[in-house]
From Swiss-Prot:
The lineage of its organism: Bacteria, Pseudomonadati, Chlorobiota, Chlorobiia, Chlorobiales. Belongs to the GreA/GreB family. InterPro entries: GreA/GreB_C_sf (IPR036953), TF_GreA/GreB_CS (IPR018151), Tscrpt_elong_fac_GreA (IPR006359), Tscrpt_elong_fac_GreA/B (IPR028624), Tscrpt_elong_fac_GreA/B_C (IPR001437), Tscrpt_elong_fac_GreA/B_fam (IPR023459), Tscrpt_elong_fac_GreA/B_N (IPR022691), Tscrpt_elong_fac_GreA/B_N_sf (IPR036805). This is Transcription elongation factor GreA. Necessary for efficient RNA polymerase transcription elongation past template-encoded arresting sites. The arresting sites in DNA have the property of trapping a certain fraction of elongating RNA polymerases that pass through, resulting in locked ternary complexes. Cleavage of the nascent transcript by cleavage factors such as GreA or GreB allows the resumption of elongation from the new 3'terminus. GreA releases sequences of 2 to 3 nucleotides. The gene is greA.
Length: 159
């Protein structure tokens, strides 16, 4: 069993749906590819068969990974999240101290739910790690590949 992971109800349901799709439809498609490749004869020199078996191996690993994540998941209730500090599932409004006009907002989530296009960043990302445990008014310096970012926490809230 892996480490405990924290998910929203939506995040848990998305993983569950993905697992269902992979273990039913996708698994069936891969088995059909294996059967088709097997029908071509000699398996010792059958690249199509080898590719299908490799795909099956990767699929089964992904299914196992999803099963482990779901088994070790704790579903968080946003109503129970405190906003005195930055925690998982809190949203944070930040002012860029290098460009006072830039205000950004992130929601800290587990790695499984991270989506930068939606402003959802992993608590394990450099930004997430720098923000966890901080309070309104705190200034943070975040090391990223392009250098350092400097922010002030303006607000902590739950969406």
């Amino acid at each position: 069993m892996s480490d405990r992971i924290y998910l929203t109800r939506d995040g848990y349901n998305r993983l569950k749906e993905e697992l269902h799709l992979l273990s039913t439809q996708t698994r069936k498609e891969v088995l059909e590819k294996i059967a088709e490749a097997r029908s071509h004869g000699d398996l010792s020199e059958n690249a199509e068969y080898d590719a299908a078996r490799e795909e099956q191996s990767q699929l089964e690993a992904k299914i196992g990974d999803l099963e482990n994540k779901l088994a070790s998941a704790t579903i968080l209730d946003p109503k129970q999240i405190k906003t005195d500090r930055v925690y998982i599932l809190t949203s944070v409004k930040l002012r860029n101290l290098d460009d006072e006009d830039e205000i950004i907002e992130y929601t800290l989530v587990s790695s499984e739910e991270a989506d930068s296009d939606l402003g959802k960043i992993s608590v394990r990302s450099p930004v997430g790690r720098a923000l966890i445990g901080k309070s309104v008014g705190d200034k943070v310096t975040i090391s990223v590949p392009k250098g350092e970012l400097h922010y002030e926490i303006l607000d902590i809230f739950v969406k």
